[in-house]
Curated annotation (Swiss-Prot):
Expressed in leaves, stems and roots. It comes from Swertia mussotii. The gene is CYP76B10. The chain crosses the membrane at residues 5-25. This is Geraniol 8-hydroxylase. Its main location: endoplasmic reticulum. GO terms for biological process: monoterpenoid biosynthetic process. It comes from the Eukaryota. GO terms for cellular component: endoplasmic reticulum membrane. The keyword Cell membrane does not apply.
Length: 495
C-alpha cells in the first residue's frame, strides 16, 4: 500500500513537473509576455484572490508592464504601465478593439445588441453615433442641464430632511437613486424611483441586482466548457433580472409610440431615438433602443454613484481637503447654494478633487476586457489570437514612477497639471481610451462635480457614530465597479 502510494505520488509530481516544463518551453517558443508559471487545469487563477486589480499589480512588479497569465482556459494579457496602455489602446487600438464577453451578458443575448459588447463594425458605429449625438453631445447635454439641476436639488432636499432627524445618509445609495432618476428623466421624462416611497423600489433593486451578479467571479468565464451547466446560476439569475428590466422598458416604449400617434411630443432622448428608428430603421430599431436603455441604466448609475461615494469618503477622511473645497465654493458661489454646471469653470479645486478621486479609485479598475481577433505583436511579444486583454488602470494611477506620493489624496497635484481624463494622457485613463472610450464621459464630468460641490456647499458632514476621520474604512470591493467594501454613512448638518 505504501509502495503504491509512493508510486502514485511520484507519478503525480512527475506529471506536474513535465506539464510545467512543457508549458515553460511552449511560452518561450511563442514569445508570450512573461508571467507566473501556471498550474495544471486552473492556470494562474489561484493568484487572483478577491481583489484581482491588487494581485495583478503586485505580479506586474515582478513580471513587467505587459504580462501573460493563464486563467483557466483563457490566455490573458495584463497591461500595467501608461506606455503599454498607449500601445494597446491608441497605437494598435483596432487590433485590440473587440470585447471579451462575460457569460452573464449572454442573458437575453444582450451582447448581440449592446454598444458596449458589439464588435467594432457598421452596427456598432451606427449605435455609437446615435448615442453620442442624441444623449452625450454638448448641445444635448446643454439642453438637459435643467433636468440635472432639478435632480441635484432633490438630492439636497433628501439630505436636508435626513439632517432634521439626525439620520445618517447612505451616500452611495442616495447618489445611486439620483443617477437613476437623472437617466430616467433624460430618457423617458419621468422618475423611475422615489426617495420617499417604495413604489419604484423593485426597479431600483433590479438594477442593483444586475450589478451585483455582473460583478461576481464566474467560473464559466474561465472555463467556457461549463457554459451549458452555468454552475453558479449567474446567467440564469441575470436572465430573470434582464427580462424584467427589458419588459419595463418595452412598456415605456410602447406607451410612447401610442403618444406619438396622438401627436404628443416630449422632446426627450426616447422621442429622438424613436424618430430616428422610423426614418433610418437600418441604423437603429426598437430592440436596439430597448437594449441601449439597459446599457445606460446599468453602466451609468453605478459608476456615478460609486465615484461620488469615494469622493465624499476621501473628503471625510481628509477634513483639510473638505475645508479647502468648501472655502472655494463659499468664495465663488456663496455658502449654502447648489452648484450649477456653469459654475464649474470657476471651481478648479473641486474639479481637481474629482480627478484625484478617479485617479485613486477608477470606477472600472481593469477597464472592460478587450479581446484579440488575430495574433498581435506588442513590443516584441506575441499576443495570441482570442487572448483576453486587461488594462490595470488602478495600478497605472498609483504608479510611483508617475505620481509623487501616489496613495495620498491630494487634489492640488492637478492645479498646475495639464493632464486630462479624456483618453489622451495615459497616466490617467479612468474612462478608457481609443474608439472604445466610455461614451458617458461628457455627462460624468458635468454630473459628478455638481453633485459633490452641492453636497459640500449645502452641509457640513461627519461620520456616523462619531467615527474619527483617520478610522474611516477605505477598503475596496471588486466587482463591476470598484465600490467601498463598507458603505459610507454620514450625517449632514445644513450650512
Amino acid at each position: 500500500m505504501d509502495f503504491d502510494f509512493l508510486t502514485i505520488a511520484i507519478g503525480f509530481l512527475f506529471t506536474i513537473t513535465l506539464y510545467q516544463a512543457l508549458n515553460f518551453f511552449s511560452r518561450k517558443s511563442k514569445n508570450l509576455p512573461p508571467g507566473p508559471s501556471p498550474l495544471p487545469l486552473i492556470g494562474n487563477l489561484h493568484l487572483l484572490g478577491d481583489q484581482p486589480h491588487k494581485s495583478l499589480a503586485k505580479l506586474a512588479k515582478k513580471h513587467g508592464p505587459i504580462m501573460g497569465l493563464q486563467l483557466g482556459q483563457v490566455t490573458t494579457i495584463v497591461v500595467t504601465s501608461s506606455g503599454m496602455a498607449k500601445e494597446v489602446l491608441q497605437k494598435q487600438d483596432l487590433a485590440f478593439s473587440s470585447r471579451s464577453i462575460p457569460n452573464a451578458i449572454h442573458a437575453h443575448d444582450q451582447y448581440k445588441y449592446s454598444v458596449i459588447w458589439l464588435p467594432v463594425a457598421s452596427r456598432w458605429r451606427g449605435l455609437r453615433k446615435a448615442l453620442n449625438s442624441n444623449m452625450f453631445s454638448g448641445n444635448r447635454l446643454d439642453a438637459n442641464q435643467h433636468l440635472r439641476s432639478r435632480k441635484v436639488q432633490e438630492l439636497i432636499a433628501y439630505c436636508r430632511k435626513s439632517s432634521q432627524t439626525g439620520d445618517a445618509i447612505d451616500v452611495g445609495r442616495a447618489a445611486f437613486r439620483t443617477s437613476l432618476n437623472l437617466l430616467s428623466n433624460t430618457m423617458f421624462s419621468k422618475d423611475l424611483t422615489d426617495p420617499y416611497s417604495d413604489s419604484a423600489k423593485e426597479f431600483k433593486d433590479l438594477v442593483w441586482n444586475v450589478m451585483v451578479e455582473a460583478g461576481k467571479p464566474n467560473l464559466v468565464d474561465y472555463f467556457p466548457l461549463l457554459d451549458k451547466v452555468d454552475p453558479q446560476g449567474i446567467r440564469k439569475r441575470m436572465t430573470i433580472h434582464f427580462g424584467k428590466i427589458l419588459e419595463l422598458f418595452g412598456g415605456l416604449i410602447d406607451e410612447r409610440l401610442q403618444q406619438k400617434k396622438a401627436k404628443g411630443v416630449n422632446d426627450d432622448v426616447l422621442d429622438v431615438l424613436l424618430t430616428t428608428s422610423e426614418e433610418s430603421p437600418e441604423e437603429i430599431d426598437r430592440t436596439h433602443i430597448q437594449r441601449m436603455c439597459l446599457d445606460l441604466f446599468v453602466a451609468g448609475t453605478d459608476t456615478t454613484s460609486s465615484t461620488l461615494e469615494w469622493a465624499m469618503s476621501e473628503m471625510l477622511k481628509n477634513p483639510e481637503k473638505m475645508k479647502a473645497a468648501q472655502a472655494e465654493l463659499a468664495q465663488v458661489i456663496g455658502k449654502g447654494k447648489a452648484v450649477e454646471e456653469a459654475d464649474l469653470a470657476r471651481l478648479p479645486y473641486l474639479r481637481c478633487a474629482i480627478k484625484e478621486t478617479l485617479r485613486i479609485h477608477p470606477p472600472v479598475p481593469l477597464l472592460i476586457p478587450r479581446r484579440t481577433e488575430q495574433e498581435v505583436e506588442v513590443c516584441g511579444y506575441t499576443v495570441p489570437k482570442n487572448s483576453q486583454v486587461l488594462v490595470n488602470v488602478w495600478a497605472i494611477s498609483r504608479d510611483d514612477a508617475i505620481w509623487k506620493d501616489p496613495l495620498s489624496f491630494k487634489p492640488e497635484r492637478f492645479l498646475e497639471s495639464e493632464l486630462e481624463m479624456r483618453g489622451k494622457d495615459f497616466e490617467l485613463i479612468p474612462f478608457g481610451a481609443g474608439r472604445r472610450i466610455c461614451p458617458g464621459l461628457p455627462l460624468a464630468v458635468r454630473m459628478v462635480p455638481v453633485m459633490l460641490g452641492s453636497l459640500l456647499n449645502s452641509f457640513d458632514w461627519k461620520l456616523e457614530g462619531g467615527i474619527a476621520p483617520k478610522d474611516l474604512d477605505m477598503e475596496e470591493k471588486f466587482g463591476i465597479t470598484l465600490q467601498k467594501a463598507h458603505p459610507l454613512r454620514a450625517v449632514a448638518t445644513p450650512l
